[in-house]
Amino acid sequence: MFGFIEGVFLVLTITEFILGNLVNGFIVSINSSYWFKSKKISLSNFIITSLALFRIFLLWIIFIDSLIIVFSYQTHDSGIMMQLIDVFWTFTNHFSIWLISCLSVFYCLKIASFSHPSFLWLKWRASRVVVGMLWGALLLSCVSTMSLMNEFKIYSALTRSKDTPNMTEYIRLKRQEYNLMHVLGNLWKIPSLIVSLVAYLLLLLSLGKHTQQMQQYSIDSRDQSAEAHKRAMRIISSFLLFFLFYFLSFMILSSSRFLPETRIARIIGVVISMSYLVGDSFILIVCNNKLKHTFVAMLPCECGHLKPGSKGPSAS
């Protein structure tokens, strides 16, 4: 039944889908154009471009999933179609999350300043460390996707047993096992979350100490460099906040099958996920000078907060 909640959900989904494709498509087109013209691309821009491209795929997958939730919810957890969506979603989403982690580590090693020997060793080898992380992320994404095979086998056994009489207890146990496997699939995301959290917190700690020192020794408390570091801290905090909200959406989607209002929980999880894919990509534009300058030039009126002269944490 198509009600008020489904109507609002559909409007939000379509709006976020269009905005997400525009924002991420802008990142891909601008960076690809510079790459084609100069025949080279920095590691950070390569990661950002790859991330935007994978987010476009994610937006399409989530949009298709949203249409199934609204118009054919009874078939949402069944059939080959949903298994294909699960496979593409798992790989694309897992690799996208690791791309965020790689970008976080890269910014941390490039911007943060600590005197610890281990940190300095990693800082001098930042590019090699991040490239190694990218290969590891690709491998882990493949492994996490292959782990779905066991979940599909359980679901297949569950489907076959429905047509067999006197199998109530077996069906109940298999359903519990299937739901548990689905929830445990989120454990693959924990390592990338920890890596990103550590990188973000180190960045905030380093920028906070640096800003404090500059305010202490600077005659003018509104020193341009201090203001730049404050802006960087706000941007990093925004990244962290969006990232935590994205993981919250996973928890909602995974636990939805254990809640009385399963459909509502899934709707909330989908809206949060798509909001993240739009909002976080916009922050990527704001904190990247090349993307920001092009974006501001395309605006019909000049925005004070996005003037080309204002610098983010990344100058690449």
From Swiss-Prot:
Pfam families attached to this UniProt entry: TAS2R (PF05296)
Gene3D superfamilies in alphabetical order: Rhodopsin 7-helix transmembrane proteins
Residues exposed to the Cytoplasmic side: 29-50, 108-128, 208-234, 288-316
Disulfide bonding pattern of the chain: none
Superkingdom of source: Eukaryota
Subcellular localization, as worded in the UniProt entry: Membrane
Note, other: Several bitter taste receptors are expressed in a single taste receptor cell.
Name used for this protein in its record: Taste receptor type 2 member 3
Organism: Mus musculus
The organism's taxonomic lineage, starting at the top: Eukaryota, Metazoa, Chordata, Craniata, Vertebrata
Name of encoding gene: Tas2r3
